[in-house]
Amino acid sequence: SIEIEIDGVTVTTEESRTLVDVAAEAGVYIPTL
């Protein structure tokens, strides 16, 4: 697993997950096309 920080929120997740999915789970919206 890896630890990333998004908007000041530290999230631990698996390496195979996408950043957009992890951000959404943490309550952070990242606009996509």
Swiss-Prot record:
GO MF, any single term: 2 iron, 2 sulfur cluster binding
Signal peptide positions on this chain: none
EC number in record: 1.12.1.2
Keyword ATP-binding belongs to the record: no
Cofactor binding: number and manner: Binds 3 [4Fe-4S] clusters per subunit.
Keyword Iron: yes
Cofactor(s) required, per the database record: [4Fe-4S] cluster
Domain (2Fe-2S ferredoxin-type) ranges: 1-33
Reported function: Subunits alpha and gamma of HoxS constitute an NADH--oxidoreductase.
UniProt record similarity statement: Belongs to the complex I 75 kDa subunit family.
Name under which the protein is recorded: NAD-reducing hydrogenase HoxS subunit gamma
Organism: Rhodococcus opacus (Nocardia opaca)
Gene for this chain: hoxU
